[in-house]
Amino acid sequence: MKDKCKVIAIANQKGGVGKTTTTVNLGVALARMGKKVLVLDSDPQGSCTRCCKIEDPDTLEVTLSELMAYEMTGEDKDYILINNAIKQFENIHIIPSNISLSGTETALFNCMSRESVLKRTIEPLRNSYDVILIDCMPSLGMMTINALVAADSVIIPCEPSYLSVKGLDLLLHSIARVKRQINPNLQIDGVLMTMVDSRTNNAKDITRALRDAMGISINVFNIEIPRSVRATECPNVGESIFVHDPNGKVAEAYANLAKEVISLERKAQVRPRPHGLR
């Protein structure tokens, strides 16, 4: 019997903290461990779509926007439509996005049960995948709320800088509100420090302060994603870090992150997590 699919939102309202890089490379790493992975690009900028070497996304006939539009109008989404939306990148599948998703987000405000449109959209896909990763847009708008409602858990990429860490409070408040009002099973898998230059005291001090502030209530992954020129090249060449720099430290870090994500899921199946966010 197939294990339950886990939906993970990769979220932070601050841009440039490694959300898309984490989504793609964590997805590839999980697939390398035998998981069947689907990535959803829920950002109208289509950063994840472009990173996955999908050229001219604005010319695509079926994207996440069209699938959500069908859900909003109550029309049936047949498997032909869904299959036309799904693209292949290395060892993972992706449902791409383009600028039309901006219009979809606006339309959500006039939709019944607007916070759960994405959840209903991806429900038919859960039986086909082990993991669904949602690359969230850099805002706390309606699309990000939809991602949090659709998700089982959240991973929060965070750069070791004062402004990035300071902005976590607003995101954590939004997650707590979604958990309290709509999605009581939503959990935080952890805060992931990205683009870490371990040579600098500043990065070490900020990471240490974050761990102290979170205490035992919110996990801060021991794994950190190092700053790397090779990693920044990946979107330009349309490759994951496992293809572009397979023996580098970033590939090793994402491989270890994938192991920890699977370990968290196994622990959750053994014992219940504490109720609520503290």
Where is each model-derived feature located?
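P-loop NTP-binding core
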Residues: 1-278
